[in-house]
């Protein structure tokens, strides 16, 4: 049970008056089947309800979102390798999705999308190749869809059909190779994020290109066996290959009225948050 009340002025200034009550029931259930000492299968179902936040109420009249989450997985655990696979289907009603727009204080605006779903698979692997070398990686492949999404374009409300949910790349991959020898370690990490849309209308203007970045961390420790103090040196190279990319941004639309023809034209705009090129961080830690 959630009781949400707020009364007062917000930026503008404008008066906000919220009086909302929600009664939620969020059951969860699952089964695990042990195949042998190394493998098990599992299935789970959960019901989730979530109320809008204050910013959502300030920017509209939102409804709480409702989720039915189904998951099916396999786990492998052995001496050298751990592997997890997870199939998921998340069916939403009134999911609160980002529109791509920002409010007057720069906070992202969300809206209810009606019916939507997320369907995909997650794979995770932790592999001890040797005593001194490990390789950890994970990948997520998904389809994230708004069903029959409506949008006001050029003065008319149109059904765009199925569209991609904003800020939901279909592919995310990360990998870490960890080398440990004595009192030194080297970690090479890589991350790939596929292309995504910053809005829910599948506009090419709102598309954010995929990117692939790598980091390198070098660590060296002195006096590691000392009972008095330890000295730790770290050198971190971010964006090792100096990739130029934007990891986020915003997308907005507005209507422009032609005073001569009386026609309404929907204009699209976009902004990006470019990330830093190759950069470094060094540190020394003295531990007593």
Located regions from the model:
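Signature of Gram-negative outer-membrane beta-barrel scaffolds
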Residues: 1-36, 136, 151
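Transmembrane beta-strands of outer-membrane beta-barrel pores
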Residues: 1-5, 45-51, 78, 87-93, ...
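Gram-negative outer-membrane beta-barrel transporters
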Residues: 4, 89, 111-201
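Outer-membrane beta-barrel translocator domains and adjoining extracellular loop/strand segments
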Residues: 5-13, 52-60, 95-104, 142, ...
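Conserved C-terminal beta-signal and adjacent last beta-strands/turns
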Residues: 32, 43, 68-72, 130, ...
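Membrane-embedded beta-barrel scaffold of Gram-negative outer-membrane proteins
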Residues: 34, 40-44, 64-150
């Amino acid at each position: 049970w959630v009781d949400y009340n707020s009364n007062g002025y917000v930026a503008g200034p404008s008066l906000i008056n919220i009086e909302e009550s929600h009664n939620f029931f969020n059951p969860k259930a699952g089964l695990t089947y042990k195949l042998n000492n190394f493998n098990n299968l599992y299935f789970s179902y959960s019901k989730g309800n979530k109320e809008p936040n204050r910013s959502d109420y300030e920017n509209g009249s939102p409804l709480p979102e409702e989720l039915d989450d189904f998951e099916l997985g396999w786990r492998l655990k052995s001496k050298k390798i751990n592997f997890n696979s997870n199939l998921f289907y998340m069916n939403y009603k009134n999911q609160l999705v980002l529109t791509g727009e920002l409010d007057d204080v720069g906070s992202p605006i969300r809206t209810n999308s009606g019916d939507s779903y997320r369907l995909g698979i997650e794979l995770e692997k932790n592999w001890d190749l040797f005593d001194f070398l490990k390789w950890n990686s994970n990948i997520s492949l998904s389809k994230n869809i708004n069903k029959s999404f409506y949008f006001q374009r050029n003065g008319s409300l149109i059904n765009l059909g199925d569209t991609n949910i904003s800020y939901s790349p279909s592919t995310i991959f990360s990998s870490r190779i960890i080398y440990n020898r004595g009192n030194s370690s080297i970690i090479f990490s890589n991350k790939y994020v596929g292309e995504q849309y910053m809005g829910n209308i599948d506009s090419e203007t709102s598309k954010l290109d995929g990117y692939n970045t790598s980091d390198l961390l070098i660590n060296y420790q002195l006096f590691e066996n000392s009972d008095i103090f330890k000295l730790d040196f770290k050198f971190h190279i971010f964006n090792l290959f100096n990739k130029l990319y934007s990891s986020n941004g915003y997308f907005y639309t507005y209507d422009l009225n032609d005073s001569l023809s009386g026609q309404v034209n929907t204009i699209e705009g976009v902004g990006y948050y470019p990330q830093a090129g190759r950069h470094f961080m060094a540190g020394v830690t003295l531990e007593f």
